[in-house]
Amino acid sequence: MTKPDLASLEKTIEKAFDERDGINTATRGEVREAVEQSLILLDRGEVRVAEKQADGNWHVNQWLKKAVLLSFRLNPMEVIKGGPGQSSWWDKVPSKFDGWTANEFEKAGFRAVPSCIVRHSAYIAPNAILMPSFVNLGAYVDKGAMIDTWATVGSCAQIGKNVHLSGGVGIGGVLEPMQAGPTIIEDNCFIGARSEVVEGCIVREGSVLGMGVFIGKSTKIVDRATGEVFYGEVPPYSVVVAGTMPGKNVPGENWGPSLYCAVIVKRADEKTRSKTSINELLRD
């Protein structure tokens, strides 16, 4: 197979996005082909919306996000088969598994439990497990990740190797509202049940979030040991729980409502990691 010319694809997508008001379901030719090829490459994991650099920073391929957005203008609404009880949906994005047989699933190498939903252009790596969950388009789920029941992986989100997203976890998307960078959960993190990480925040490698921790760009993440406050990023190997901080006093009173924050209570040690490590038996 010929290696795709990514520079040419990027150029076409960028130009098309600048002229997006003129793009619709009747658009054919170079623009449609570039968008469709970009989504196929995302679906295969040959490209990804964000890539970690050697210095630890993440580079965002904005043109791939733009390709995903352009696909909504190009594709008409249509019947999407595969609903419960042989019902259907009405949408613009087909299932990743559309037309798959046992051969495709064997080759992909991950487990997809009944009722999980993965949209076309999301990549799922080998040895990942998808419980009844939702993975949105453009997302990247790396090797050995567990996406537990009712967890949601938002558009273009990046989920690292051996990450465990517990039941009901929400990882925010970045298409609406359009954020600068995707939400990222780095390798070997454990995200506790019903927690939410949104707005392009990053949870660095090896961190553990307890149940019900909510992190957005404006959330104060307080290191209890040092008093340092972080925004938008959980440092590596942090153990984080939900907490509160004193708020300003209300006018004329000596009290005020406390405000939510996330608290780093310690750094993940061997005991913590043993409690949150993956179970290889589930991935055989």
UniProtKB/Swiss-Prot annotation:
Q: What is its main location?
A: cytoplasm
Q: Which family does it belong to?
A: Belongs to the transferase hexapeptide repeat family.
Q: In which pathway does it act?
A: Amino-acid biosynthesis; L-lysine biosynthesis via DAP pathway; LL-2,6-diaminopimelate from (S)-tetrahydrodipicolinate (succinylase route): step 1/3
Tagged with keyword GTP-binding: no
EC no. given is 2.3.1.117
Task: List positions binding substrate.
Answer: 111, 148
Task: Tell me the SUPFAM superfamilies matching this sequence.
Answer: Trimeric LpxA-like enzymes (SSF51161)
- What binding partners and quaternary form does the record give? Homotrimer.
Classify the source by domain of life. Answer: Bacteria
Per its UniProt record, what InterPro entries does this chain match?
DapD_Trfase_Hexpep_rpt_fam, Hexapep, Hexapep_transf_CS, THP_succinylTrfase_dom1, THP_succinylTrfase_N_sf, Trans_hexapeptide_repeat, Trimer_LpxA-like_sf
Could you tell me the keywords of this UniProt record? Acyltransferase, Amino-acid biosynthesis, Cytoplasm, Diaminopimelate biosynthesis, Lysine biosynthesis, Repeat, Transferase
Per UniProt, subcellular location reads as: Cytoplasm
User: Which Gene Ontology cellular component terms are annotated?
Assistant: cytoplasm
Protein's name according to its UniProt entry: 2,3,4,5-tetrahydropyridine-2,6-dicarboxylate N-succinyltransferase
- Catalysed conversion reaction: (S)-2,3,4,5-tetrahydrodipicolinate + succinyl-CoA + H2O = (S)-2-succinylamino-6-oxoheptanedioate + CoA
